[in-house]
Amino acid sequence: SQNEQDSRHYAEAAKIPMLEPSDSEECKNFTKLAYTISETFDAPAFLRLSTRVSHSQSLVELEEPEEVALKPYEKDAAKYVMMPANAIKRHVVVEERMRKLAEYAETCPINRVESKGNKIGVISAGIAYLYAKEALGDQVDYCKLGMIYPMPKQMLLDFAAQHETVYVIEELDP
């Protein structure tokens, strides 16, 4: 499509993780992390970019490229061909993977809390996080989500419990 679409719903529908960077540096780092998550959990991973992040420019720290050996292709029709008989068996695997991804989301380093003991908290992700930081500065605490699906439910509950008022600042459907 030539116009912007809100792809957040696809992650939940497909039951695969989604990462949302807020700047150029995070785009690079989250791309690498997406591959790591994909290999660890044996699933694809979405990297959600909004127009504002895609068109932004900022300095990026580069590391030395890593050589990664290609794994040999292993034909596995039961895993990759979703005919009804295979899909029924794979559904259990998908649900177990989502449970493990939800656990991972709670400790994932790209989900973080920035707390200075303020009464107001802001939950945000992507470019909306940077907009909130620019507008509100140190007047509020932040829960910055880098992995937006699955969401770190306990982290969000704990963050909300520590604040009198919590705002969610996000980009909405275009």
PLM feature segments, named:
Residues 13-16, 174:
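Short alpha-helices
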Residues 1-13:
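Flexible glycine/proline-rich, aromatic-decorated loop/lid segments
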Residues 21-174:
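Flexible, low-complexity linker and terminal segments
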